[in-house]
């Protein structure tokens, strides 16, 4: 039985994670973490998540929660995730990170912090999205430079980073398949007299509003034809189920930083 702890019990993802751990086979909820002095600290995690009393109280003691688990699932923010990753490293415990908005420097630090533990850092835990990453690579490599690429992503009004980590990864996958430098060709701004579209650029458009869970569409636009690859998240359960799947996979893996492509055998 793999013991899973969840970070961020008060959040929407944290609550879905608690439910998904309870529904999965071969795992159990060993601990739930919230920030110090949060009003939910001390309450039963199952009651907070709406799945009935579990006998697991929400804690604000990071080290104690990590000590009691085999793997920690973290959907918070980059700075918090890196702190939790470092704490897991000190206790030789695995971690699954679903936070988005990491800078290149923060990703590099994450790699350095996984010298002694196995960890997963992925912008999207959905199985469907990760299959899309693989499909995008094949489409881009086949079409080559004859098609323009544009990416449109939509999320709820509360999302704090833009573009989404998933959209960025989609752009990186396409750029890699086409032999382009993503940081150079990604275009996030079009306004006024922009001139003609450059051949290499990958456009990135962001929509924020309401309660959209997450939608991504990649357009491959040619002369007289267009291919659209879309993924729409109907709820957060697919993210939480994917995270639990990742947690069961990462325990026992060799030290290093992995992603969902590794979990699903898509590399």
UniProtKB/Swiss-Prot annotation:
GO cellular component labels: cytosol
One GO term in the molecular function aspect is: NADP binding
EC class (word): oxidoreductase
Q: Where is NAD(+) bound in this sequence? A: 8-13, 34, 98-100, 122-125
Q: Which reaction does it catalyse?
A: (S)-2,3,4,5-tetrahydrodipicolinate + NAD(+) + H2O = (2S,4S)-4-hydroxy-2,3,4,5-tetrahydrodipicolinate + NADH + H(+); (S)-2,3,4,5-tetrahydrodipicolinate + NADP(+) + H2O = (2S,4S)-4-hydroxy-2,3,4,5-tetrahydrodipicolinate + NADPH + H(+)
Has keyword Protease?
Answer: no
> What is the first-listed, main subcellular location in coarse terms?
cytoplasm
Task: Supply the Pfam families for this chain.
Answer: DapB_C, DapB_N
Q: Which domain of life is it from?
A: Bacteria
UniProtKB keywords: Amino-acid biosynthesis, Cytoplasm, Diaminopimelate biosynthesis, Lysine biosynthesis, NAD, NADP, Oxidoreductase
Protein's pathway: Amino-acid biosynthesis; L-lysine biosynthesis via DAP pathway; (S)-tetrahydrodipicolinate from L-aspartate: step 4/4
Question: Where's the active site on this chain?
Answer: 155 (proton donor/acceptor), 159 (proton donor)
- Compartment(s) where it occurs, according to its Swiss-Prot or TrEMBL record: Cytoplasm
Q: What does the UniProt record say this protein does?
A: Catalyzes the conversion of 4-hydroxy-tetrahydrodipicolinate (HTPA) to tetrahydrodipicolinate.
Give the protein's recorded name: 4-hydroxy-tetrahydrodipicolinate reductase
Species of origin: Pelobacter propionicus (strain DSM 2379 / NBRC 103807 / OttBd1)
């Amino acid at each position: 039985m793999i013991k899973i702890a969840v970070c961020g019990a008060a959040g929407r993802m944290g609550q879905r994670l608690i439910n998904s751990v309870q529904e999965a086979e071969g795992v159990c909820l060993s601990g739930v973490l919230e920030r110090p002095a949060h009003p939910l600290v001390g309450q039963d995690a199952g009651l907070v998540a709406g799945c009935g009393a579990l006998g697991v109280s929400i804690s604000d003691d990071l080290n104690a929660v990590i000590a009691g688990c085999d793997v920690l699932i973290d959907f918070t923010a980059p700075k918090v995730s890196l702190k939790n990753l470092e704490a897991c490293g000190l206790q030789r415990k695995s971690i699954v990170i679903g936070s988005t908005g990491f800078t290149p420097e923060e990703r590099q630090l994450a790699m350095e912090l996984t010298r002694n533990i196995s960890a997963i850092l992925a912008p999207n835990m959905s199985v469907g999205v990760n299959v899309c990453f693989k499909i995008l690579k094949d489409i881009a490599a086949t079409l080559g430079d004859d098609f323009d690429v544009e990416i449109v992503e939509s999320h709820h009004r509360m999302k704090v980073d833009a573009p989404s980590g998933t959209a960025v990864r989609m752009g990186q996958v396409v750029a890699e398949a086409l032999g382009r430098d993503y940081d150079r060709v990604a275009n996030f701004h079009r306004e006024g007299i922009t001139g003609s579209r450059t051949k290499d650029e990958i456009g990135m458009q962001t929509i924020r509003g309401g309660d959209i869970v997450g939608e991504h569409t990649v357009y491959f636009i040619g002369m007289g034809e267009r291919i659209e690859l879309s993924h729409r998240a109907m709820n957060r359960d697919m993210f939480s189920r994917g995270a639990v799947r990742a947690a069961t996979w990462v325990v026992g893996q060799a030290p290093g930083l992995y992603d969902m492509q590794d979990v699903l055998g898509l590399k």
